[in-house]
């Protein structure tokens, strides 16, 4: 469930545009742009309404992964020379896919944006914005506030909801799955709700109330995937809409965040490594904003508020990892910050939640999850180690000062609810049916020694009763960019694979964020090759410890994860049998040299500036997948790209695919008759964008590819898919 209490850290650090949803939905540590950072989400059964027949939006919990961003036109389909023909008869995969696509949509669980405010719950029902009494939120007794079809968009869905403090207005951001463009509608609440106004291309937005009891909406405007302008608007008899702030540095973006107690609205001006925050008084929004601390290169900070004190999560000072500091709200400058709490070394701060008497930190340390509960009255700290099966948090809305609810999940286990009760000082877990996967599978935390001696964590899943793991298929997952954790949310198809005997391995290589800020720093710019060395070490370690073998090893990556995946295919193709890539970033050099692209300047801190720095240019040439394709044997590759993806270089994907096929053809000629060429498939999906949900068609196509390339029997896996995907 969502309301104005938001994911604190994710709303800020992980709203960076490269995540795939700047100022729109999000993916979390770096999550989906479905405002998974910007709003709190709960699983809710979606009820179709009679008023509209458009299918509702299905979204994934942690989809927001950093990404390149582009527009691409005049795309020509790629001739799939090496693609194996499908059998004439419809096989098990096709039957499953067909059944999934024709199944009534309401049979599936939907991630639905909800906001609880006052005595009401606001949410999307079918294609309508509705509200119902809190106690009636799970039945069909609701009031329709706005029909999304009035906007005449194709399959619209609500991305974010904000309710004005006195519930005179509600603002909703509406998008379609084919575009990242959004429309923010303002609905005046009355006996007959009406749309008061609408604004295009809104990213983040928040309500405050001024001294005259008038509702004021602050919002950011997105142009060419960048958010540089902040506006404020009023409605009713005193309508006004004015630009309030413009960020002139193109390498920064702007994001709004309302502190949990609604006392301050923060204007967050950020890039990948540096931030600056201004405070707007929630009681006097027309007063000039107050600067907390002018931007200092390399210093990140995020702000919460409680009882006239600011709590600042920052990397300032040594060590350069996040620490919690505190200062009086009327003396916010950095020289007044006092150290309040420090993290252990190699600890990742996933989120922070502020309560009346407690501050709760959600952490990852040594590849395990923890919750630290800090008593603000006595500075006491209670550290709770969470179950070892858990790999990810899903934050829940919380307006109750006595409880802190959240969910835990893993790639093969559906989310489970937990609640920390402050009065008892204990963590309570949801009771009921125990997931059988806990008894039929194992989760292992392993480490691989990289080329320079650095230990790289891995998370491995396999069936408990599996015998001779060396003969089992292995699916490697990698990302390693932007300081983002490898996505480990629940995926039904991953569970099906484990049930069918697969080994899943998640390699937390440098460049990601699993071990904190330094882990990211050691895998960006002129240290990108560390991530590649880590990935190679992980795969070799798994093989050496008896997990699968190269002929049964596959690799999957999304977006910027395609850099390491593509680089490995160039330098060590013998480690892999098949690779699946989704919206992959494959041409780093040409992309970063094109400063006309909307986000290139914001990406310089991650990849470097090859246009002005010869050192960066030469270094990128060493690992860039496109630049290093050569005539040799490659694993089979399945690439999924999206026709309307604004954030990934689609032309670059096409060029990469053609160049790869040419290299394979040249190698085949040199090798001679009898050479078995790998299967190279480019699947360009119509519509969609970089943050579109996983479709059943895509899932079945990718699994089909893996099974066929490894020569495995797919009969049982599709029966299980039918069960887990609910038809």
UniProtKB/Swiss-Prot annotation:
Name of the protein this chain belongs to: Prolyl endopeptidase-like
Catalytic-site annotation from UniProt: 559 (charge relay system), 645 (charge relay system), 690 (charge relay system)
Residues in coiled coil: none
Keywords, ordered alphabetically: Cytoplasm, Cytoskeleton, Golgi apparatus, Hydrolase, Nucleus, Protease, Serine protease
Enzyme class: hydrolase
InterPro entries tied to this protein: AB_hydrolase_fold (IPR029058), Pept_S9A_N (IPR023302), Peptidase_S9_cat (IPR001375), Peptidase_S9A (IPR002470), Serine_Peptidase_S9A (IPR051543)
GO CC field: cytoskeleton; cytosol; Golgi apparatus; nucleus
Protein localization: Cytoplasm, Cytosol; Golgi apparatus, trans-Golgi network; Cytoplasm, Cytoskeleton; Golgi apparatus
Described function: Serine peptidase whose precise substrate specificity remains unclear. Does not cleave peptides after a arginine or lysine residue. Regulates trans-Golgi network morphology and sorting by regulating the membrane binding of the AP-1 complex. May play a role in the regulation of synaptic vesicle exocytosis.
């Amino acid at each position: 469930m969502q309301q104005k209490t938001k994911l604190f850290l994710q709303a800020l650090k992980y709203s960076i545009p490269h995540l795939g949803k700047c100022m729109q939905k999000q993916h979390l540590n770096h999550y989906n742009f479905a405002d998974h950072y910007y709003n709190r989400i709960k699983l809710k059964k979606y009820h179709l309404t009679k008023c509209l027949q458009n299918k509702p939006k299905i979204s994934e919990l942690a989809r927001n992964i950093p990404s390149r961003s582009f527009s691409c036109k005049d795309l020509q389909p790629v001739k799939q020379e090496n693609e194996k023909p499908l059998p004439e008869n419809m096989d098990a995969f096709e039957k499953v896919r067909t059944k999934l696509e024709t199944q009534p949509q309401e049979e599936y669980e939907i991630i639905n944006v909800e906001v609880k405010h006052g005595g009401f719950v606001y949410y999307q029902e079918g294609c309508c914005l509705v509200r119902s009494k809190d106690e009636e939120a799970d039945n069909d007794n609701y009031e329709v506030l706005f029909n999304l079809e009035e906007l005449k968009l194709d399959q619209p869905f609500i991305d974010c909801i904000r309710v004005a403090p006195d519930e005179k207005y509600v603002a909703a951001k509406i998008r379609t799955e084919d575009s990242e463009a959004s429309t923010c509608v303002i609905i005046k609440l009355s006996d007959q709700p009406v749309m008061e106004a609408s604004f295009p291309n809104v990213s983040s937005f928040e309500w405050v109330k001024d001294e005259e009891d008038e509702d004021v909406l602050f919002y950011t405007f997105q142009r060419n995937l960048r958010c540089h302008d902040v506006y404020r608007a009023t409605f009713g008899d005193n309508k006004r809409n004015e630009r309030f702030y413009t960020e002139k540095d193109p390498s920064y973006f702007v994001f709004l965040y309302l502190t949990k107690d609604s006392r301050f609205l923060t204007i967050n001006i950020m890039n990948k490594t540096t931030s600056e925050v201004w405070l707007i008084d929630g009681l006097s929004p027309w007063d000039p904003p107050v600067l907390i601390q002018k931007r200092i290169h390399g210093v990140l900070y995020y702000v919460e508020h409680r009882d006239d004190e600011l709590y600042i999560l920052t990397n300032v000072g040594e060590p350069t990892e996040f620490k919690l500091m505190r200062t009086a709200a009327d003396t916010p400058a950095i020289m007044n910050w006092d150290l309040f709490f420090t993290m252990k070394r190699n600890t990742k701060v996933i989120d922070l939640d502020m309560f009346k008497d407690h501050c709760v930190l959600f952490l990852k340390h040594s590849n395990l999850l923890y919750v630290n509960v800090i008593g603000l009255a006595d500075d006491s700290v209670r550290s709770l180690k969470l179950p070892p099966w858990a790999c990810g948090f899903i934050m829940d809305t919380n307006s109750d000062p006595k409880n802190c609810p959240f969910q835990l999940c893993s790639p093969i286990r559906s989310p489970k609810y937990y609640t920390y009760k402050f009065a008892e000082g204990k963590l309570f877990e949801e009771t009921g049916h125990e997931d059988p996967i806990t008894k039929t599978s194992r989760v292992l935390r392993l480490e691989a020694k990289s080329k320079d001696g650095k230990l790289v964590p891995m998370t491995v899943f396999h069936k408990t009763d599996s015998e001779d793991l060396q003969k089992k298929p292995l699916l490697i997952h990698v990302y390693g960019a932007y300081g983002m954790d490898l996505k480990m949310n629940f995926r039904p198809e991953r569970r099906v694979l484990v049930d069918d005997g697969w080994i899943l391995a998640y390699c937390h290589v440098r460049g990601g964020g699993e071990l904190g800020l330094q882990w990211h720093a050691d895998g960006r710019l002129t240290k990108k090759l560390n991530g590649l060395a880590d990935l190679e070490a992980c795969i070799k370690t798994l093989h050496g410890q008896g997990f699968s073998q190269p002929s049964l090893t596959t690799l999957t990556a999304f977006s910027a994860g395609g850099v390491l995946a593509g680089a490995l295919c160039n330098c060590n193709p013998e480690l892999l049998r098949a690779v699946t890539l989704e919206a992959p970033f494959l041409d780093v050099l040409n992309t970063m040299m094109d400063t006309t692209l909307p986000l290139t300047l914001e990406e310089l801190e991650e990849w470097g500036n090859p246009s002005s720095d010869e050192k960066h240019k030469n270094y990128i040439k060493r690992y860039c997948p496109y630049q290093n394709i050569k005539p040799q044997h490659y694993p089979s590759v399945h690439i999924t790209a999206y026709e309307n993806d604004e954030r990934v270089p689609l032309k670059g994907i096409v060029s990469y695919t053609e160049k790869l096929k040419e290299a394979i053809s040249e190698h085949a000629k040199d090798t001679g008759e009898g050479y078995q060429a790998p299967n190279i498939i480019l699947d360009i999906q119509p519509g969609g964008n970089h943050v579109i949900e996983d479709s059943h068609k895509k899932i079945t196509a990718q699994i089909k590819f893996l099974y066929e390339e490894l020569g495995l029997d797919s009969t049982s896996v599709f029966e299980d898919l039918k069960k887990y995907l609910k038809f």
